[in-house]
């Protein structure tokens, strides 16, 4: 006869299920606490910044990838893994043009897919294709087929080419469907402020990459003359311009976010992009008006900042024209 503890009907199997359920419940509880805690964004920025400072972006992507898998599998909120997921892509700028260095990270793809399937098995949602779905589908097709009559097959399958064609095409469509379906659920937090926090953290991650490039050049040469050439400056400019308004929105409740806006603006200027200066100045001016209308700063303070910015532009004009 079987021992009672090995009885699959009510013994061993029931205990195993209870143990697994208890373990997953704790894992899920810790994931939700981390996602909703104040430590969420600082921890992610610390991980990304530490690995970028050490010059080990591949290991940083692995670390962030493990966090993504944990949050995806254990947290019911699909927004939780978004920030570390995109931070991993921002860290790849340190090997821009040499994305083959990240091929070992492909080992994270199977557990990532399994975590995604597990997430929708445990917390199922009804997929919804919103009004932008058809437009994004057409953009995805255009992205995949664009340049097919010009570039060679070898160029098309290069890691950097696949990164853009798949990421900006099919990847954006998949993300849109997932989040369009998921964001209809009720939440215990302000969704707008949480989105702003995610963009703010991504902007700070990109700013850290730019500032670390200058710090390493200064440590290597003892001084930094002019603006460094950054191979990823257009990419960095796009990320920073997108994220720049977010700290000003968050500063309505916490003035400390204005420092974050200043760091992003500094990194934007150091990218060496003329479009960064032009559009960055426009965004900062609009953000200043936004802060004034909400009583964060006075009209006199805004005028003083505008005059100081104008003097700085005139002083830096000759240098800017040389870029």
Pin down the residues of each PLM region:
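Membrane-interface micro-motifs in multi-pass membrane enzymes
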Residues: 54-59, 98-107, 164-165, 226-242, ...
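Hydrophobic membrane-targeting signal helices
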Residues: 113-116, 140-147, 211, 288-291, ...
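Alpha-helical transmembrane segments of multi-pass inner-membrane proteins
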Residues: 67, 171-174, 190-221, 230-294, ...
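Hydrophobic alpha-helical membrane-embedded or membrane-associated segments
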Residues: 37, 46, 138-141, 168-172, ...
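Transmembrane signal-anchor helices characteristic of membrane glycosylation enzymes that use polyprenol
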Residues: 53, 207, 308-322
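Transmembrane signal-anchor hairpin modules in multi-pass inner-membrane enzymes, especially those
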Residues: 1-148, 184-193, 250-255, 297-305
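Juxtamembrane "helix-exit" motif on the non-cytosolic side of transmembrane helices
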Residues: 93-97, 147-156, 214-220
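Aromatic-anchored transmembrane helix interface
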Residues: 105-112, 133-146, 156-180, 238-239
């Amino acid at each position: 006869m079987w021992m009672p503890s090995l009885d699959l009907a009510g013994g061993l199997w029931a205990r195993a299920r209870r143990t697994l359920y208890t373990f997953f419940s704790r894992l899920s509880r810790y994931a939700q606490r981390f996602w909703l805690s104040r430590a969420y964004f600082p921890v992610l920025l610390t991980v990304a910044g530490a690995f970028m400072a050490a010059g080990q972006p591949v290991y940083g992507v692995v670390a962030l990838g493990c966090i993504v898998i944990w949050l995806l599998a254990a947290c019911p909120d699909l927004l939780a893994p978004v920030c570390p997921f995109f931070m991993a892509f921002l860290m790849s700028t340190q090997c821009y043009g040499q994305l083959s260095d990240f091929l070992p990270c492909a080992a994270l793809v199977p557990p990532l897919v399994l975590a995604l399937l597990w997430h929708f098995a445990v917390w199922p949602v009804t997929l919804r294709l919103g009004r932008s779905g058809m437009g994004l589908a057409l953009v995805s097709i255009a992205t995949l087929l664009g340049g097919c009559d010009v570039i060679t097959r070898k160029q098309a399958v290069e890691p950097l080419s696949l990164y853009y064609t798949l990421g900006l095409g099919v990847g954006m469509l998949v993300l849109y469907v997932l989040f369009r379906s998921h964001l209809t659920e009720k939440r215990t937090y302000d969704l707008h402020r949480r989105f702003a926090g995610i963009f703010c953290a991504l902007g700070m991650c990109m700013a850290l990459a730019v500032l670390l490039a200058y710090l390493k050049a200064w440590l290597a040469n003892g001084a930094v003359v002019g603006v460094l050439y950054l191979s990823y400056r257009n990419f960095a400019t796009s990320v920073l311009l997108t994220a720049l308004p977010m700290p000003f929105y968050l500063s309505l409740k916490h003035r400390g976010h204005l420092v974050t806006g200043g760091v992003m603006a500094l990194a934007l200027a150091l990218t060496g992009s003329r479009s960064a200066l032009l559009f960055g100045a426009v965004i900062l001016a609009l953000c200043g008006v936004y802060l004034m209308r909400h009583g964060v700063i006075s009209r006199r303070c805004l005028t003083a900042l505008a005059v100081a910015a104008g003097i700085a532009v005139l002083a830096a004009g000759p240098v800017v024209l040389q870029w």
